[in-house]
Amino acid sequence: MSNSETTSIMQEVKPEKPWINRKQSLREVARPLFIATLISVAIVLVTGLAGPLGFYVAFVLSFIVVSFVDGMRHDKVKAIDKVMTTLITAGFATAFIPWASILLTVFKRGASAIYFGFFTNDMSVTAADDDLGMGGLSHALVGSLLILLMASLVAIPFGIITAVYITEIKGKFSGVVRVVVQSMSGVPSVVAGLFIYAIVVSRYSFSGLAGALALAILMLPTVARTSEEVLKLVPEDLRSSAYALGASQTATTFRIVLPTARSGLITASMLGLARVAGETAPLILTAYYSAVYSLKVTGQPLASLPMYIFQNFSTGTDTALTRAWGGAAVLLSFIFILFIFARIAGRGSRK
């Protein structure tokens, strides 16, 4: 065989790369889906499984069986791979469908309540049966922002200081502090509300400040634990280099470690805010509810978005329920924005 013939054969034969997933053709993907759909329809008709949930269960089970049989045409490893891929996809869909259903339900039912005045008016002169074109949640939106701002001023500094003590100072009580913080993460929100009610509200009155203190108790462990994990990601070489240059532990912490972890600490703060933004139980016992716009955070009740939703649902009229759904849509949007900021800050942390 000549050199030219050998070269041409080598050019035609391409080396296989089994570590790279081969793209499946449309036919390979559509065939199992089509067969599983037919089997699912037959199962639903025969067994009487009702509704989309019954069809979904039948489809997942059918698709697992069909994927295994289809994979056995090649080999056992291929069959197991197809089954595991199906299980992972089904798990993702099972988690995603309820979440998407909640969002669609909230925004669909609350859409009719949302208009421009919904964000500029309060409920001071609006009754429960008044038209949806009257009233709004500006008082609740402003109240929530005030309560969350005050809670952040308490929880974020203390949470970061706690994380610094655990990861940087590593005092003899750091283990105890870590256990306490972890235990606080499991405290029911109503317990935090009862605690502030007994200490503050019973002696003075319902107020936005009392609500902020209750939310700060719930927010602090989230900020502390997330900040601890962020500070652990700071390379040890940075600390060693600072100490080698003669920097003290305080200077190293505040000039090297914290600036390096700044984006991650912002993420921790945003996650803490998102954790408490929708809490209702502690606000029932602390801030309560007011139908009027107010910036006063002491001496009187202060409205908030969770309490606005709760109050309208408790009223029970059709228009009040629609306003509650509208408030829920605004609250979900607010929390979604917080998570977007957390993700953006997290990218900076990874860099």
Kindly label every feature range from the protein language model.
Residues 67, 231-232, 267-270, 311-351:
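C-terminal transmembrane helix and the adjacent membrane-cytosol boundary/short C-terminal tail
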Residues 52-62, 134-164:
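Transmembrane alpha-helix signature in integral membrane proteins
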Residues 12-15, 19-22, 44-50, 71-90, ...:
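Periplasmic/extracellular loop-to-transmembrane helix junction in inner-membrane transport proteins
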Residues 182-215:
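Generic hydrophobic transmembrane alpha-helix motif, especially the helices
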Residues 283-332:
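Interhelical loop and adjacent transmembrane-helix boundary motif
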Residues 69-77, 151-181, 194, 343-347:
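Transmembrane-helix boundary motif in ABC transporter permease subunits
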